[in-house]
């Protein structure tokens, strides 16, 4: 269970304060915060019937390399049919509205992590209900970014130490927000939001613990891959698909993520669609990353210290 001292505050989209900076986040303190909510339960709505989400998903799927991964129309229909069973609370759906208006990078990212993880889950999770459960976590894994200033999310130059800590804050913030809305700190979406940046070797954040949950790992790998192949403000362009797959393969070789989910991703990038268990993956690197990329680069503070509370 988490035990974190929060560096920054956590508020809902309607500016309801849940935690102040410096607060201790534990399951017990979150239960107390949940009890303060006067709403017993939030109305839910099917994700793909909300706004333009279904249309937007299909548009994003028409962008390479997703055109290769999702070239089978039946596969897309099966995915959409499963996705139509997934419902979200209105505050969660409103977070997607927020990202669509203020940060299209994050908006497209959470939708593509949703569809890609749902596809990979079909190979890796034999239980249908398990796949539905995982599918419901894709669009919410980055909900904590509503607590990160938009100028940080869109920054094109290296982040300062304070800005980097704000960005990493989104994992804990997502755990809190989803626990608050679902009234359940044990919900899989809460775990995914908190742990999708953890790694098998313990090198991730926010807790630096070994990632052991295979469901969370499907989201984690989908998250990494989409972030590489799509444009981002902090680099000169997207990774080409070969280089992106080499990066993800390299992470498996370093025991940061597991081989099964990486092989499933590679299998869907091959025209023959082999069984992921029969995929052979080369660890040789021949791709070329973008020439300008400041992801992970931290620079000196240039302005007044952060005093957010």
Question: Which residues are covered by each model-predicted region?
Answer:
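Terminal helices and disordered tails flanking the catalytic cores of nucleotide-processing hydrolases
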Residues: 1-93, 238-309
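Acidic/His-rich, divalent-metal-binding segments that scaffold phosphate/diphosphate chemistry
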Residues: 42-168, 180-185
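Residue-level signature of transmembrane alpha-helix interfaces in integral membrane proteins
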Residues: 157-158, 233, 239, 274
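Short glycine-/small-residue-rich flexible loop motifs, especially phosphate/cofactor-binding loops
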Residues: 30-31, 118, 175
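Alpha-helical scaffolding flanking metal-ion-dependent phosphate/phosphodiester catalytic sites
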Residues: 113, 136, 140-147, 165-176, ...
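Residue-level signal for pocket-adjacent positions within structured domains
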Residues: 5, 13-14, 91-94, 147-148, ...
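Short alpha-helical linear motifs
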Residues: 154-163, 192, 213-217, 265-270, ...
């Amino acid at each position: 269970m988490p035990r974190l001292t929060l560096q920054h505050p956590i508020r809902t989209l309607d500016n309801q304060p849940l935690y102040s900076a410096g607060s201790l986040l534990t399951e017990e303190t979150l239960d107390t915060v949940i009890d303060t909510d006067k709403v017993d339960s939030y109305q839910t709505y099917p994700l793909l019937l909300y706004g333009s989400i279904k249309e937007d998903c299909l548009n994003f799927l028409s962008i390479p390399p997703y055109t290769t991964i999702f070239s089978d129309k039946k596969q897309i229909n099966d995915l959409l049919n499963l996705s139509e069973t997934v419902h979200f609370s209105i505050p969660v759906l409103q977070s997607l509205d927020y990202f669509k208006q203020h940060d299209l990078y994050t908006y497209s990212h959470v939708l593509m992590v949703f569809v890609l993880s749902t596809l990979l889950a079909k190979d890796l999770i034999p239980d249908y209900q398990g796949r539905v459960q995982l599918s419901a976590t894709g669009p919410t894994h980055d909900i904590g970014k509503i607590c990160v200033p938009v100028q940080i999310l869109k920054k094109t130059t290296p982040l300062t130490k304070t800005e980097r800590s704000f960005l990493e804050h989104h994992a804990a913030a997502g755990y809190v927000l989803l626990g608050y809305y679902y009234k359940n700190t044990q919900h899989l979406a809460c775990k995914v939001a908190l742990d999708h940046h953890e790694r098998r070797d313990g090198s991730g954040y926010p807790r630096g613990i070994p990632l052991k949950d295979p469901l969370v790992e499907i989201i984690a790998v989908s998250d990494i891959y989409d972030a590489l192949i799509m444009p981002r403000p902090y680099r000169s362009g997207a990774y080409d698909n070969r280089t992106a797959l080499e990066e993800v393969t390299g992470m498996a070789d370093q025991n940061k993520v597991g081989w099964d989910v990486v092989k499933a991703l590679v299998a869907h990038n091959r025209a023959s669609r082999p069984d992921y268990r029969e995929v052979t993956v080369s660890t040789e690197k021949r791709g070329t990353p973008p020439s300008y990329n400041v992801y992970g680069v931290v620079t000196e503070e240039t302005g007044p210290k952060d005093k957010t509370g």
